[in-house]
Amino acid sequence: MNWRFVELLYFLFIWGRISVQPSHQEPAGTDQHVSKEFDWLISDRGPFHHSRSYLSFVERHRQGFTTRYKIYREFARWKVRNTAIERRDLVRHPVPLMPEFQRSIRLLGRRPTTQQFIDTIIKKYGTHLLISATLGGEEALTMYMDKSRLDRKSGNATQSVEALHQLASSYFVDRDGTMRRLHEIQISTGAIKVTETRTGPLGCNSYDNLDSVSSVLLQSTESKLHLQGLQIIFPQYLQEKFVQSALSYIMCNGEGEYLCQNSQCRCQCAEEFPQCNCPITDIQIMEYTLANMAKSWAEAYKDLENSDEFKSFMKRLPSNHFLTIGSIHQHWGNDWDLQNRYKLLQSATEAQRQKIQRTARKLFGLSVRCRHNPNHQLPRERTIQQWLARVQSLLYCNENGFWGTFLESQRSCVCHGSTTLCQRPIPCVIGGNNSCAMCSLANISLCGSCNKGYKLYRGRCEPQNVDSERSEQFISFETDLDFQDLELKYLLQKMDSRLYVHTTFISNEIRLDTFFDPRWRKRMSLTLKSNKNRMDFIHMVIGMSMRICQMRNSSLDPMFFVYVNPFSGSHSEGWNMPFGEFGYPRWEKIRLQNSQCYNWTLLLGNRWKTFFETVHIYLRSRTRLPTLLRNETGQGPVDLSDPSKRQFYIKISDVQVFGYSLRFNADLLRSAVQQVNQSYTQGGQFYSSSSVMLLLLDIRDRINRLAPPVAPGKPQLDLFSCMLKHRLKLTNSEIIRVNHALDLYNTEILKQSDQMTAKLC
């Protein structure tokens, strides 16, 4: 060996991590990857990532060839050692260094910076020197395989890989035949890439013809390379700084200082490289990979919807009636072909989810010290409930080329794209009780027939209640005075006599057409006394009117509280009109022309009309009283001569209730109630008096429908019981028995839910 060769061996340096290959002349199938522990440090840094073998592997991996298989053999020729470094006494016997290298050390000075070390020494000479090695050559065959393509071509990827292994093992026996067969497989399937490698004396006649020095160094387990850090040939005062500079160059790519503290190592970036800790290229690749995985996730769901199993399932679903989520779930569970296809989807999405999680963890680990914060959200798995809702949307919200989402609670579609053309005709609901027995053939949205106990009315099933004409024999709910609201408002303004209800005015505190002081509560009542005078009628109130006159420059604002007794009784058995609440109307105040009088009108209309027997009106006033008048009493005659007091006085010249009377047959209704009462006490069957039960249920429903409004969530007032008590003179026990009998018939025979009511009387 000449001096040039020995000198080259002395200063041969290795730039990165050395991957030890499998045992001599044994095949090796490995998945190349970077150590997870140092992902954020060595990713895209150092010469290792620019080496020929690593770049070749990365390129193949991006093309889908995820598995590498290599078979090789080595030929050792010479064993070389660095005898100069093996000397222990470097002071007496210094290492024979090249003049250029010695000059570079002298240029460093005694306190060099990291950048000086990198530019002067490391970039030129590297970080390690060779202690001992074996010179020789290598002959290798490398195959990159895509198992997914092999699986599609042959049906079994495991058997295909084993067959390729057996074929490659004959490479050193029949090189030409093996390569010819492998090239045929490569061209026909596209699932493998084959590469031959020959280095060292096998491929070259002399050292001068070699492409690189490393091609003659054997790196197997039998022929190990022994390296030593370059700091051993530096003076002692430069050794620590060299190690720090070498680590900064390898781990930080020369863009910062490599620092370790509390078992945590990082790069302290220089000002011109603020992102040295951030492998932006790898982060972009991972973000792109995650985006593709999310697309694959969505495509997996689309593949199921486009599969033959799913399409056949949709065709087998019945279309002659409405399908709820529960009924679709039942059909879903009974379709075995669809279940097997759905299990394949679940296993595929689970594997995809694990890949996404691993990639996301790597992404967030790499971006720990980056200014760039990755924004990634794991795709949500579609639950079985969402699949059933999707089926429902495909059934009813997929029309005219538009699509939408079906809401079962509202039985309607929310169309996408600001249109309402996606909804198909929603079929009727088939079931028990008031559901349809069959949908109409002419219009599938309407009922064609009903269950027993129900009748078909305008495409809907309603209980077979008694005819309205029969109910009219007991109470004449329908009269000639059932005007529309606009007509009622016009008649009230004209004070039409047809709407007058003649009542008796009662008050111990107020006289009509007489001024009084309203600063304290005043009470007045309007009653009919139907129990004595008009026993064959019950009465309906649709409005009220009062004419109130005030003194000039008066600051009073009257305020009314109105209580209504529907069928007589004490004051506690009345209810308060909730003015302005729950949609209830307010008083309307209109001033009369050339007068200090106002017409106060309350129009209930058809929506809020109700029964009444007595109306109690409490009058108060809202005003700011002077300090001297706050402690005065309001009793006694008024003094109109005192100008400081008369501005508070008002008078009521007229109070009128508007409505009409309904004919009421108390004897006939009492006999029907007694029949139900006797049947209940004797334990008789309900069907023996079903017509009477239906009649009383209809009357109770129509009476309670006229109850006053209540707050949301609170039960409605029971006016029917008040009528039984005050107009039919039933006892409390009889009222309870009648209501209980009606409730039992309604729930057990008609299968309808009872409406909760609150006791008033």
Curated annotation (Swiss-Prot):
Domain spans labelled MACPF: 68-251
Main location: cytoplasm
GO cellular component, one term: cytoplasm
Transmembrane stretches, start-end: none
GO biological process, one term: proteasomal protein catabolic process
Sites carrying sugar chains: N156, N433, N443, N553, N599, N631, N677
Alphabetical UniProt keywords: Cell cycle, Cytoplasm, Glycoprotein, Growth arrest, Neurogenesis, Signal
Signal peptide: 1-19
Protein family (similarity comment): Belongs to the BRINP family.
PANTHER family per record: BMP_RETINOIC ACID-INDUCIBLE NEURAL-SPECIFIC PROTEIN 1, MACPF DOMAIN-CONTAINING PROTEIN
Additional comment: Silenced by methylation in 50% of bladder cancer cell lines.
Protein name: BMP/retinoic acid-inducible neural-specific protein 1
Species this chain originates from: Homo sapiens (Human)
GN (gene name): BRINP1
